[in-house]
């Protein structure tokens, strides 16, 4: 069982657009939604599922809109919420910004989309690329000779339409890894992991098949093999285009890609990561007068690599004033609204160490520090480098017309949730 009706409301609870799918819930029931939501909010008991009588309201908020689904019987809640988020995604791809104004400007196309997205309360066609084939931005169906059914009906490859042509055939592949790190005040790594993804931008004619090979040291969990220098990927998720049966047999990632931009796969490595940028800080507080910081930043990756746009965010007391800075490289800025100083280094080569000193005045009567000390956080991006060591060995493009295509591969390592606690 899924949704009876779907509504889009403004912030006051006024219905902008709605679609009744099953006819078993009075459409005026939605008038109870906003009063119940405000009441629960005041009580501090707000929930994503609200109830009035026998009707359930499942809702999400996006910008200045509420998307609400109603149901009278036992609904599959996870399915309904997945559908609501999919509606947001599809509408955003059509209108770029999903907000009250874009709803008011596109009533016709939204009704068409709601008819295709769900049928009798069950999600149907939710792939925006398929929807864009026969629901255009102007809200009129494409007329190309005889009416044709959507790709999902005629084509086994529902994520890619036929007849795509490019003058220049190219594929761009990005291996992006984010490092999550938490270091204790005494320098012990408490938590470290790598969250990676392979993202692609595909501009290829026809119906090409791509084969991607990763380096031999990469293992997928449950391979049953263990090497000391292997990289064992966990929580691997593939785009629907990947032929899983072939992958299960020989670990080849073979697929017919969607057109344009998409995420081919994501993965995680729950492994000990040597901190790429190490921070040591000494903070001296002189009672009722001043506080001094000495912060040392060291890059702990190979000399041939360089971290770009490094930002080191150092928390300072709310009542600090009269800042003075001295640094061996980069620039330092005080951001009083965030109670922090930001040390920016545009280019930070591997194997280097830099120093920054800061001095602040303190009021004679200090505010009591009840919240403890926030950690130092670091932002960075290292091109041509992956922490895990994952590499693309080959990317083959096979298409029956035999055209030549250019594959471009790049690697990026960046910060995720990267924090170092202070003494």
UniProtKB/Swiss-Prot annotation:
Annotated compartments: Golgi apparatus; Cytoplasmic vesicle, Clathrin-coated vesicle membrane
One GO CC annotation: trans-Golgi network membrane
Any GO BP annotation: vesicle-mediated transport
Keywords assigned: Acetylation, Cytoplasmic vesicle, Golgi apparatus, Membrane, Phosphoprotein, Protein transport, Transport
Pfam families on file: Adap_comp_sub, Clat_adaptor_s
Post-translational modification: Phosphorylation of membrane-bound AP1M1/AP1M2 increases its affinity for sorting signals.
Source species, domain of life: Eukaryota
Membrane topology: Peripheral membrane protein
Main location: Golgi
N-acetylserine sites (modified residues): 2
Residues modified to Phosphothreonine: 152, 154, 223
The MHD domain, residue ranges: 168-421
InterPro entries assigned: Adaptor_comp_med_subunit, AP2_Mu_C_sf, AP_mu_sigma_su, Clathrin_mu, Clathrin_mu_CS, Longin-like_dom_sf, MHD
Signal sequence interval, chain numbering: none
The protein's assembly and partners: Adaptor protein complex 1 (AP-1) is a heterotetramer composed of two large adaptins (gamma-type subunit AP1G1 and beta-type subunit AP1B1), a medium adaptin (mu-type subunit AP1M1 or AP1M2) and a small adaptin (sigma-type subunit AP1S1 or AP1S2 or AP1S3). Interacts with MARCHF11.
Function of the protein: Subunit of clathrin-associated adaptor protein complex 1 that plays a role in protein sorting in the trans-Golgi network (TGN) and endosomes. The AP complexes mediate the recruitment of clathrin to membranes and the recognition of sorting signals within the cytosolic tails of transmembrane cargo molecules.
PANTHER family: AP COMPLEX SUBUNIT MU
Similarity section: Belongs to the adaptor complexes medium subunit family.
Identification of the protein by name: AP-1 complex subunit mu-1
Organism: Mus musculus
């Amino acid at each position: 069982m899924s949704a009876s009706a779907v509504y889009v409301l403004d912030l006051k609870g006024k219905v902008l657009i709605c679609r009744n799918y099953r006819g078993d819930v009075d459409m005026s029931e939605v008038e109870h939604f906003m009063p119940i939501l405000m009441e629960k909010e005041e009580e501090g008991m707000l929930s994503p599922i609200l109830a009035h009588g026998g009707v359930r309201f499942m809702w999400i908020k996006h910008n200045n809109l509420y998307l609400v689904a109603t149901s009278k019987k036992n609904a599959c809640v996870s399915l309904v919420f997945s559908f609501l988020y999919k509606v947001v995604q599809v509408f955003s791809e059509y209108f770029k910004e999903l907000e009250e104004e874009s709803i008011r400007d596109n009533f016709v196309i939204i009704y068409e989309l709601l008819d295709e997205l769900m049928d009798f309360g069950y999600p149907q066609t939710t792939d925006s690329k398929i929807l864009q084939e026969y629901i255009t931005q102007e809200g009129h169906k494409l007329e190309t000779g005889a009416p044709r059914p959507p790709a999902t009906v005629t084509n086994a490859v529902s994520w890619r339409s036929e007849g795509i042509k490019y003058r220049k055939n190219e594929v761009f592949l990005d291996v992006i890894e984010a490092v999550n790190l938490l270091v204790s005040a005494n320098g012990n790594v408490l938590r470290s992991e790598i969250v990676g993804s392979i993202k692609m931008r595909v501009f290829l004619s026809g119906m090409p098949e791509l084969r991607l090979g990763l380096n031999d040291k990469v293992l997928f969990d449950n391979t049953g093999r263990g090497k000391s220098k292997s990289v064992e990927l966990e929580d691997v998720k593939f785009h629907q285009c990947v032929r899983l049966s072939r992958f299960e047999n020989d670990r080849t990632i073979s697929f017919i890609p969607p057109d344009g931009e998409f995420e081919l796969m994501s993965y995680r490595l729950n492994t000990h990561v040597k901190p790429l940028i190490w921070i040591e800080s000494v903070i001296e507080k002189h009672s009722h007068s001043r506080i001094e910081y000495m912060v040392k930043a060291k890059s702990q990756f190979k000399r041939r690599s360089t971290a770009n746009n490094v930002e080191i965010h150092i928390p300072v007391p709310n009542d600090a004033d009269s800042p003075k800075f001295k640094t061996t490289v980069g620039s330092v800025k005080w951001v009083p609204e965030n109670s922090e100083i930001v040390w920016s280094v545009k280019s930070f080569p591997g194997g280097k160490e830099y120093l920054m000193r800061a001095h602040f005045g303190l009021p004679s009567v200090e505010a009591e520090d009840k919240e403890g000390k926030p950690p130092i956080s670091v932002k960075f991006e290292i091109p041509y480098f992956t922490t895990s060591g994952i590499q693309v060995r080959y990317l083959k493009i096979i298409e029956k017309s035999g055209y030549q295509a250019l594959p471009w591969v790049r690697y990026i390592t960046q910060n995720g949730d990267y924090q170092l606690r202070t003494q």
